[in-house]
Amino acid sequence: MYKKILLSIAVLGLCSCASSSSGVGEDSKLEAYNKAMFEFNYQLDKKLIKPVATGYANITNKFMRNRVKSFFNNLEEPTYMVNNLLQGEIKNTGISVGRFVVNTTLGLFGMFDVAAGWGLEKKKTTFDATMAKYCIPDGPFVVLPVVGPSTPRHLVGWTADAYMSPIYWSLSNSDSQKENLIVWGTTGLKYINLRAENMALLDSLESSSVDFYEASKSAFMQNRKKFISLCSKNDEEDIPNYDFDFEEDYED
């Protein structure tokens, strides 16, 4: 798989970054679909995901949720390692390797960020950022079922990152139904924990917005553009939490 990814980047890297390929003009063609899908996701969140996340928040405290968040953040380090390598950031690749080893062992499977105390700060990046570096255009804004706000490049990047994750390899290498249930259960915990952590933020965005769809779209696009920009400048230390996107994420 990685050979295919490297080959794709090598070919696409020959292109030039044309501003005319931003896909902005195509957004309006998808507007009706996007709004309908946004409403579907909103109702799904309102009637299922948010109540579960609220119940979860009521039986946990901030310390516990931070340990869960830190555990899953640590599982993203191999993804950062691969993408930093693909971007030619050798130093950052080494830091990601070091962080994963240190935090998985001394940090109790990543529940504590011991590496940061040793000066090994997180060098977060994604395959989305890797494609951006090789001049692959973002494409139009689109809302996907359950996943939420996205773009074609973001979706490809998100999928590629998922394939690099230890969680994926745990699923693909397991023949046991019990093990699969454990992996799927922990994955569900990841997203419920993320939703609980972002509860106040999303409620505030909704209550202060005249048009929640437009506000969510604007927040998503601005956050990802800033994240991609900061990744290209190697300025990870200044990156705030961009796991705000309504799918996942993954928090810092």
Model-predicted regions and their roles:
Residues M1-K4:
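Positively charged n-region of N-terminal signal peptides that target proteins for export
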Residues G13-S16:
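C-terminal motif of bacterial Sec signal peptides marking the signal peptidase cleavage site
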Residues A18-S21:
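Bacterial signal peptide processing site
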Residues G25-L48, G55:
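Post-signal peptide N-terminal segment of mature Sec-exported envelope proteins
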Residues P51-G55, M81-V82, V142:
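Alpha-helical transmembrane segments of multipass membrane proteins
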Residues K62-G88:
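A glycine-rich, hydrophobic loop/mini-helix early in the fold
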Residues N74, Q87-P152:
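Mid-length scaffold segments of soluble, non-membrane domains
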Residues C135-D252:
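A structured, mid-to-C-terminal "fold-capping" secondary-structure block
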